[in-house]
Amino acid sequence: YVSPAHMTKWGDIMPVSRRLELVNYSAAHGSLVIEDDFENEFVYLQKPTPSLFGLAGGQNVVYLGTFSRLLLPSIRISFMVLPPELSALYRKKADQYNQTASKAEQIALCQFIRDGHLAAQTRKLKRLYSVKLKALRSAVREVFGKDSQIQTGAAGTSLALTLSTNLTWQELQKKAQTNGLRLQLLREAPGKITLILSCSSMPVADFVPACKLLKDISQIQN
């Protein structure tokens, strides 16, 4: 199981060379790769990389995708592309599968895609998140300084920020909640806490104030 467009929470992408290694290994050993192509639509800093499914010619790879990042998450429609031999097996047992997505939503989504609206939505969100992620990086640099420890990748809507603080994660989280900040922990080490900061739902105008608030509470001594 791999998510090549989301190797880390801050958007690292699996290079083509590594993808080819996996494809060749699965072909040589008859193994099956499950490819979850989450956030493959949001690649900004390099050209889009071919999927494992495409590189393998549809053999030995199951491709998983979702529309949750492009459309309303409440629609809850995902999809799976199977290699030919598994596709034939699935068709034989399809009546045992419990479909939870309504037919009306599936038909509407199909028409939405046919009419080109999904492609337009993808381009729109890609531009939006590219601008917002750049603004978030700038806000972090402005507030925490040019030497702040930031990790970013070529894709996604998040970055990792390492804070130097005497607080524990539980203490920082409690202070953040008291001040209206919701934080996501990546890792904790003595004197350091690494957080995942997302640009997706917060307005750009709030990036600098939120970073200033985070800096203030992380420097509070208990």
What is each model feature region?
Residues 32, 181-182:
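Residue-level detector of anion-binding/catalytic polar loops
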Residues 17, 21, 92, 96, ...:
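Inter-domain helical "communication" segments and dimerization helices
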Residues 57-127:
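Conserved core segment of the aminotransferase class I/II
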Residues 28-29, 59, 179, 221:
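Helix C-cap/helix->beta junction micro-motif
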Residues 110, 127-137, 148-162, 169, ...:
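Conserved glycine-rich beta-strand-loop-beta hairpin in the small C-terminal domain of fold type I
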Residues 82, 160-165, 182-217:
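Conserved PLP-binding active-site segment of the aspartate aminotransferase-like
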Residues 1-44:
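Active-site phosphate-binding strand-loop segment of PLP-dependent enzymes
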